[in-house]
Amino acid sequence: MQEKMEVQYMVVSFSHKNVDIATREKLSFSQEEIVPFLQEINVCDSIRESILLCTCNRVELYVSMIDKKRAREHIYECFCTHKNIALEDIKNIALMRLNQYAIYHIFSVASSLDSLVIGETQITGQLKLAYKLAFENALCAKDMTRLMHFAFKCAASVRKETDISAHSVSVASTAVRMAEQKLALCDKTLENLPVLVIGSGEMGRLACKHLQNANAQITLVSRTKENARKLALELDSSINIESWEHLEQLLGQYEVLFSATSAPNCIIQSKMVQVSQKQRWWFDLALPRDIENIQMENLHIFCVDDLEEIVQEHKNAREDSAKKAQKILERYSVEFFKWLQTLGIDPIIKHIRYLAKQSALKELDRAVKKGFLPASYQQNVEKILHGAFNTFLHQPTIRLKQASENPQGDPIIEAMKNVFDISDDVVMLNGYKCEKDTIF
């Protein structure tokens, strides 16, 4: 019998918790860079599958692998090569988690417990897109698919069983709240205040939405004007659309600005900004950052890491919900590993049920054709057979799963495959299915 290699999971993380924004900026990936990077990651024969998650708060690599030492060294070298950062620096700043700690972390990320703004729902969509990109480019398959399905189920349970995501929150909403606080110091509000929003992606959309709730007068600028028009139409508001070519002129007209583009370099440089007697508060929600580090009187520039004060207030308010959510994460982490242990037998059980189904339907069809059974009875007889086979297979299924959880269960699994003539190809095919089959 061929030696069975145990699949392990690893997370290599660079997030707002352990790396400052300047370093995250160096480590950030454009959409076009992700697939080539993951292809190089997967070259290592110790790594089976990989996903890269990039947001304004984190750059994280999720992999399934069989040799943690070789996988880790290869991953560090890939980051070093692609981002031109010294190997020792990568090793010093990377936060690595393995197996149950990796799983708990991924569930925490998906459920927004690890977010800068706890309870924000944007991260789940970002993780789904990261998984989709890797899957569609054949960079991940069953290992990560199983994990992602559990992660999204966990996130849904956290939202359903706690109020952690009540009163829609996000990095954008937190930035708008901070803008309100800064304006209040000057006896001003966002109501009827002209505000410039740069970028029509998800972060720009959220900024517009929360500014709209505050009754601000929004001007939207996007490199693609059509995208800005679509966003304005979606929000059904009186958002003013301006051309990208007018950006430099617009900068001198607004006290409050929110920028959230996916540009690879700064779009607002010091040479574009004029000195003003007015206080200005500009919020850079992008990574890499959109706004250069401009030192100018009356100009206050905030990046995502500067939202910490507001974020802490939010964390304190949701402490009870976070504790409940952590219990849910623990439950799902345990369930995931229990489920992984049964995967060796699950595909076999599915195929035995499939064989039972095919045999029953074949004989039933033959009985109807030969006139032994009226055709009008066929549907009800199918239901009876369904119940009979479920009852018959119930106890064997339990026993087989119990055997599969035992380290000595492999001979039993091999014997079942031999008795029912189940090939390894069939086991692998059924292993991709995350939900349990039924007979009918």
Swiss-Prot record:
GO biological process: protoporphyrinogen IX biosynthetic process
SUPFAM superfamilies xref list: Glutamyl tRNA-reductase catalytic, N-terminal domain, Glutamyl tRNA-reductase dimerization domain, NAD(P)-binding Rossmann-fold domains
Highest rank taxon of the organism: Bacteria
Annotated positions binding substrate: 55-58, 115, 120-122, 126
EC numbers for this chain: 1.2.1.70
Pathway: Porphyrin-containing compound metabolism; protoporphyrin-IX biosynthesis; 5-aminolevulinate from L-glutamyl-tRNA(Glu): step 1/2
Entry keyword NADP: yes
A GO molecular-function annotation: NADP binding
InterPro entries to which the protein is assigned, alphabetical: 4pyrrol_synth_GluRdtase, 4pyrrol_synth_GluRdtase_dimer, 4pyrrol_synth_GluRdtase_N, GluRdtase_CS, GluRdtase_dimer_dom_sf, GluRdtase_N_sf, NAD(P)-bd_dom_sf, Shikm_DH/Glu-tRNA_Rdtase
Record-marked site positions (Important for activity): 105
Alphabetized UniProt keyword annotations: NADP, Oxidoreductase, Porphyrin biosynthesis
NCBIfam families named among the record's database cross-references: hemA
Oligomer and partners: Homodimer.
Function: Catalyzes the NADPH-dependent reduction of glutamyl-tRNA(Glu) to glutamate 1-semialdehyde (GSA).
Domain notes: Possesses an unusual extended V-shaped dimeric structure with each monomer consisting of three distinct domains arranged along a curved 'spinal' alpha-helix. The N-terminal catalytic domain specifically recognizes the glutamate moiety of the substrate. The second domain is the NADPH-binding domain, and the third C-terminal domain is responsible for dimerization.
PANTHER family xrefs: GLUTAMYL-TRNA REDUCTASE 1, CHLOROPLASTIC
Family: Belongs to the glutamyl-tRNA reductase family.
Protein name: Glutamyl-tRNA reductase
Gene: hemA
